[in-house]
């Protein structure tokens, strides 16, 4: 900006874009599964990643990742969603929390148990 522009107008404040807009500043939100399916990751990686479409309690519809090995999610299952993107899946900015509501924890998990809802 030139000096004349600064005298005439205020400087514009830069607005930070939220990384998880669908959660509306909440740490987690409850939702209902609409569709459970697998998808393939971006270029250097190869797998079948488990994801699901979730309708949140605030009527937003998002795509969320199901972490860990194996799951028991079906259509109309209740889930708890947190923020956190999956780097190699474009458009997936949310994770489902294991062992809350209808999603069970990972069976036979020994390490990092708290992240996958496995009791001791």
Curated annotation (Swiss-Prot):
Q: Supply the InterPro entries for this chain.
A: NA-bd_OB-fold (IPR012340), Ribosomal_uS12 (IPR006032), Ribosomal_uS12_bac (IPR005679)
GO BP field = translation
Question: Keywords on this record?
Answer: Methylation, Ribonucleoprotein, Ribosomal protein, RNA-binding, rRNA-binding, tRNA-binding
Provide GO CC annotations from the record. Answer: small ribosomal subunit
Query: Which family is this protein grouped under?
Result: Belongs to the universal ribosomal protein uS12 family.
Protein role: With S4 and S5 plays an important role in translational accuracy.
- What does the annotation say about its assembly with partners? Part of the 30S ribosomal subunit. Contacts proteins S8 and S17. May interact with IF1 in the 30S initiation complex.
**The protein's name:** Small ribosomal subunit protein uS12
Task: Give the originating organism.
Answer: Carsonella ruddii (strain PV)
